[in-house]
Curated annotation (Swiss-Prot):
GO biological process: translation
Name of protein: Small ribosomal subunit protein uS17
Domain of life from the UniProt record: Bacteria
Keywords for the protein's UniProt record, in alphabetical order: Ribonucleoprotein, Ribosomal protein, RNA-binding, rRNA-binding
Lineage, uppermost ranks: Bacteria, Bacillati, Bacillota, Clostridia, Eubacteriales
Subunit comment: Part of the 30S ribosomal subunit.
GO MF term list: rRNA binding; structural constituent of ribosome
A Pfam family recorded for this sequence: Ribosomal_S17
TM region(s), chain numbering: none
Function: One of the primary rRNA binding proteins, it binds specifically to the 5'-end of 16S ribosomal RNA.
Recorded family membership: Belongs to the universal ribosomal protein uS17 family.
Listed Gene3D superfamilies: Nucleic acid-binding proteins
Length: 89
């Protein structure tokens, strides 16, 4: 029997914290339009995502996917690192 995984939500965001073990905090920005005044508003939401190998670092742009509950706050997991953060050396 094959599982249908096509309906899982995927988000792209920036890693804002990697200080926890196997967990990253990803900030996802969305642009919405106010229903009455039609002004575009930028909103952001933070998700805690599972990072099994501690690959992602602060500032990286990552893709996360919805998954089963892994802890009290974690319902997302890291799929891939889209772009590494630029470091000054």
């Amino acid at each position: 029997m094959t599982e249908n995984r096509a309906n899982r939500k995927i988000r792209i965001g920036t890693v804002s914290s990697d200080k926890m073990d196997k967990t990253i905090t990803v900030s996802v920005e969305t642009v919405k339009q106010h229903p009455l005044y039609k002004k575009t508003i930028k909103t952001s939401k933070k998700y805690k995502a599972h990072d099994e190998n501690n690959e992602a670092k602060t500032g990286d742009i990552v893709k996360i996917m919805e998954t089963r509950p892994l802890s009290k706050d974690k319902r997302w997991r890291l799929v891939e690192i889209v772009q590494k953060a630029k470091t000054l050396q």
